[in-house]
Amino acid sequence: MQEDSIEASTSISQLLRESYLAETRHRGDNERSRAEPSSNPFHFSGPGAAEGGGPEDLPDLSAFLSQEELDESVNLARLAINHDPLERVDEAQARKRLSSDQTKHASKPSFEPAFHQDSSRGPASPKDSPPETKRPQYSSETQSKKVFLNKAADFIEELSSLFKAHSSKRIRPRACKNHKSKTESQNKVLQENSPTFSDLTERRERASVPIPIPADSRDNELNHAIEQREAKRREAELAAGEAAAGDSTPGSSPSSLYYEEPLGQPPRFTQKLRSREVPEGSRVQLDCIVVGIPPPQVRWYCEGKELENSPDIHIVQAGNLHSLTIAEAFEEDTGRYSCFASNIYGTDSTSAEIYIEGVSSSDSEGDPNKEEMNRIQKPNEVSSPPTTSAAIPPAAEAQPLAAQPRVSTVQQCQSPTNYLQGLNGKPIIAAPVFTKMLQNLSASEGQLVVFECRVKGAPSPKVEWYREGTLIEDSPDFRILQKKPRSMAEPEEICTLVIAEVFSEDSGCFTCTASNKYGTVSSIAQLDVRGNEDISDNGALHSANSTTNPAVAEHQPSPLNPQPLSEEQPPKPKLEGVLVNHNEPRSSSRIGLRVHFNLPEDDKDMEASSGSGAANTSQTRPNSFPERFNGQEARIPEPSSPIKEPPPVLAKPKLDSTQLQQLHNQVLLEQQQLQNTSPSSPKESLHMSALNSAPPAVTISSKQVKGPAPQMFNLARPKHFFPASSTSTATVSPSSSPVFTLSNTPQTIQRTVSKESLLMAHPSTQGRSPGGLSIQNEPAPPSPAEPAAPPTAAYSIPSGNQFQPHCVSPTPVSPTGRIQNPVAFLSSVLPSLPSIPPTNAMGLPKSAPSVPSQGLMKKTTKAPQAVSDDYIRETKNSVILDLGKKVNFGDVRSHQQEYKISSFEQRLMNEIEFRLERTPVDESDDEIEHDEIPTGKCIAPIFDKRLKHFRVTEGSPVTFTCKIVGIPVPKVYWFKDGKQISKRNEHCKMRREGDGTCSLHIESTHGDDDGNYTIMAANPQGRISCSGHLMVQGLPIRSRLSPALSHRGRSRMQERDKEPLQERFFRPHFLQAPGDMVAHEGRLCRLDCKVSGLPPPELTWLLNGQPVLPDASHKMLVRETGVHSLLIDPLTQRDAGTYTCVATNKTGQNSFSLELTVVAKEVKKAPVILEKLQNSGVPEGHPVRLEGRVIGMPPPVFYWKKDNETIPFTRERISMHQDTTGYVCLLIQPAKKSDAGWYTLSAKNEAGIVSCTARLDIYAQWHQQIPTPISIRPSGSRYGSLTSKGLDIFSAFSSVESTMLYSCTSRSVVESDEL
């Protein structure tokens, strides 16, 4: 069979050689075909493969390929094995088409073959010349030539495409390059007899997938490829000439061109990555071990993004061990980490989930400042969805984006399908159920918002998030997290949706849906985003150098109607027709400029909504109601482009004396008209609208924008002092005509008043009109750095809800308040002061000239100095006290006004709830009993109404109320700062109604009531809890009065220096506190607590009333997360007692106490031998005892050895005994001669080991019976005479002694023993 194949090879070589000589005459045609690049890679699958073209045909390639080309082709074929399998499906079809085309046109190959005559091949060798009859039979000579020429042409064309692909600039893995150099070095020591490698090589080459040529590199490399081909052709002609001379060497083998290499191995991970949960700030290291031949190249990815070495992330390789280390893990490092390994034989990967636990169990909060900085630095950065595989070669990356598979968030949120098993081993099957529902949230623009719910079910449910019916996918703006259950005892999963920064378009209904094959359940919550109210006069305006003409703006044809979000819109839509530049950083686009008019018909809707801001899309203006300003229909210009730069927010323009005169006359006219109307109380109507008259063109300079507006006061009032409310804000239209709206309730007035308004300079004059309120303020004299500004026009509040302007000003109201001068406003509401002289509407004395000059204005500011400073101080104090009473009265009248806590505090409370639900509690205060095994339908507790957060003043009552439903009726537990509230507590009264409403009432609050209140409901189906925060605030008013004494004549710079006096102050309260603890002596004890307050409080630890001082065993630490810790290491009995932690700042102090019990350390004592073993000897056949006494704590364990060999307990004739006193005995009964030897007793316990050794000798029986006549006499001779005389000698002794006497008669007694 081998001879047949060799002869066939010889004939093929001859045919190819003849074909080559004929083809060299048509070089011109070959040059043209050579210039055509091969764009479609394909396999070699010639038509003759089934006709005998087996592995034996491969040596024929040496007839037209040089040694170097053969080696390189093998290497390139191996490289092609690592080709992306995704392309092989498309290439297979291309190969079929190419194979059929090449069969038709094989007689005209597109590439000129290069022949190389091997000196080992020729008919001169007798082994290579078998008989003619053994050759394979073909139909004709012509057909055989055609078949083999087709095969040769196909393979040559394939090799040519490989060479071209190899010469391109494709980046290959390092492992491939190393492998090539290794192969080339081995080819230098080729050996001659390797008959099997040719078969293996051909199989390798036929299975290879050539690497496609990138289209952009073909033209650049075409000339280089032609030059290389020309050089090889000339070498082939030279070699063909030598072959024609018939030069051959017998004994050479056709397979001498190849050298057999060891087979490669694809990568394989022997140690995979492991998922884990780690606390924030700790060091995280991922380790994996991968093997492969050649050593694979390893790449790391996080959520589809490749990771590289950096100061934060270290990638290390030590042999086959690959490690990824995160030096300090933060919450944004949470994600799926993957490791990909690849070499020329394949790829492998392993992945793991890393969850960074922050303060909360379900947070993914990043640093807002850091995120803001990133948005400013990278405004146009677009995040792409993570890809599932990172092992995509460069050729695949050049494909269109549509060809790449899209990974949806649903896959990331899928839970494992494994079933939890019950106690009987069978899987637990249950439909999903929410153990904690979503909560309605309200936030301001730019805040971080976290939706959290908890769900359980078996199999683990699949969780999806929707906004207004639209599926939310994981992205940097919407992070979706799902924390798997820790164990079967805690089967619930924590599902979290984190919105890094909310905007008004994010308002809407959010739904979390959990489903498995047994059911689906959903939880719905509403998110209300309030407009950004933090635009102050410190340069936050982003637009400048703009000119606006209100007259032109009034005649724009179509109004702007913001469209509400629809279900088909994505979570972050770019709303059409909204003047928001989405290409700008998100911080600059917070100034929403969409216009909303508050109509009388909309007042009810506004009161129902929980928040409305400058960019609120939940309210639209009815088209049928035209607003009229000065008798003209208002027209709002539409933006020319939805991505157009937002129009500038107008600062206050400078008014010259002529304009001041016009304003002054108009205000006086309006005041007279108001006096003629029927007076009405300010409580009846407080609807104010200001507008539509401005200078024809107002130009704002950049200096005006950057600097603070002269009349814009900082009204950033501490939010914890006055009850928060949802009032409408002033919105600015593109036509620079602001619309000012105030809610129609006196509560709004009280809530809107800013405490910092009391810190402003007292106005020189104030005026009131019978029918309304006129609010004015005057400027201070200009400082050297700032120009002087004229006074602002007055805003008057008419009676009735009319959209009729009563004053004219183009100045927008500061978004932090609805009233420009709260001091004047309060003065109008409160009783007027008799010391204030009457003024006109401009705030000037009535005797002032109609056109006041700047000097006269300065003089009028000093008019109140006629009154004594003490009187002014007393009157102001009375005003402020009256204000405090009114505020308190408003709070009591409207009961409790809830306020919104920060997202950070909310997640802290969620963490407390999470731990409380897993902590054993005392018996419930309810008289409700639950069966151990529930029967019938059971429903876990659900909150129909949750607790709210309240801010009250000291001494006010407060009531926490919620409603709980569940079957059976749940038990209820109340906690304050993690400690259960007893029903015997007289201060906190707990009630429960029949409908499930539960309440906790405090009649009179004081400072110690400040904290977190949690209610937990439990029944056999599960537990659920929710929390509310109570902030008890005093009224430290007099300590804040000093800035109110500042004169109007002081400069703005001096007022700015006093701004730190407006700092917020919060009394300390503990967010986290430990309970009573039990610790073991000698170990580490840690007491952790978390406290909040402004300024940050100082903590002091007391033990039984005495301060705990830091020393070698007591350390006080503060972590970055704000957790304070007291470390005691090692713990001693002296550390037991009552610990008290006191937090103190300038507003007060707070404390908690706990009892620390120290368990005594177990006493350990090494064994001690009290009685050692004694050397002894006994006659053979007698029993023997080896005795000793050993003590130790804990009691030791005894081991017996004979000649260093352990004596088993089951050996016959030997028994071991011991008692509680430490006595130990080894009894041998009877003793034999083989028992002689050295015996060792060892005693061992946890503290140590001790041993002792003794010798046992066994004597022969005859050794004791040798008679000694001199010292031996009959034992009974002394008493014989007495006994014969009738005297009973033995009766005179005791039974023991008599027994001894009888026993002595059995043997002779040595005299020395008797003596």
Swiss-Prot record:
Residues 166-180 have a biased composition (Basic residues). The modification Phosphoserine is found at residues 99, 129, 641, 754, 809, 814, 903, 924. The modification Phosphothreonine is found at residue 249. Residues 184-199, 609-623 have a biased composition (Polar residues). CDD domains: IgI_2_Titin_Z1z2-like. Residues 779-790 have a biased composition (Pro residues). Keywords: Actin-binding, Coiled coil, Cytoplasm, Disulfide bond, Immunoglobulin domain, Nucleus, Phosphoprotein, Repeat. Its main location: cytoplasm. This is Myopalladin. The lineage of its organism: Eukaryota, Metazoa, Chordata, Craniata, Vertebrata. The gene is Mypn.
